[in-house]
Structure formats: C-alpha cells, structure tokens
Amino acid sequence: MVTIRLQRGGAKKRPFYQVVVADARFARDGRFIERVGFFNPLAAGQAEKVNLDLERIQHWVGQGASLSDRVAKLVKDASKAA
C-alpha cells in the first residue's frame, strides 16, 4: 500500500520533515517514490513553514495512496490557504 507521510530530517532537537510518497513497508526515513513537499515546524520569521505540491498529492490519492494523519491535516490547511 502506498502512503503519503512525513520523513524526518534535520538535526537533533531541530526537526525538518519531507512529505514523501512511499510504500508502507519502507522504513520511515528510508526509500520513497516521490517527494511532494516539506514541513518545517520550527520555521521563524519569513521562513516558509509548509510547501506542498497539492496537484501531485491529488494524483497519488487518485491512484489509491492514503494520507497519514499529520499529512492529511497539513493538506487540509494548505488547500484552505490556497
């Protein structure tokens, strides 16, 4: 099953997440099929907090991919703002 989920990066105590399309069997920070955005929970000032390619996300959902809970919330907020 294909899932759209967060992949953690960044440093210790400074998380940065890539939003990726990955097979559910792959490790959280392992292989992925496509990167469709990022989420920076510690963004300050003018830094961009969320950047999502909503068109590609809709494509993958149409192909049967499921969204993780956190990504579903990010997509909902991003589509509301757009």
Curated annotation (Swiss-Prot):
The UniProt record lists the keyword Protein biosynthesis: no
Gene Ontology biological process terms, A to Z: translation
Coiled coil stretches, renumbered: none
Domain of life: Bacteria
Keyword list, A-Z: Ribonucleoprotein, Ribosomal protein
Entries under InterPro entries matching the protein: Ribosomal_bS16, Ribosomal_bS16_dom_sf
GO MF term set: structural constituent of ribosome
GO cellular component: cytoplasm; small ribosomal subunit
Entry-linked Pfam families: Ribosomal_S16
Alphabetical list of Gene3D superfamilies matching this protein: 3.30.1320.10
Keyword RNA-binding attributed: no
Protein family per UniProt: Belongs to the bacterial ribosomal protein bS16 family.
Protein name as annotated: Small ribosomal subunit protein bS16
Protein encoded by which gene: rpsP
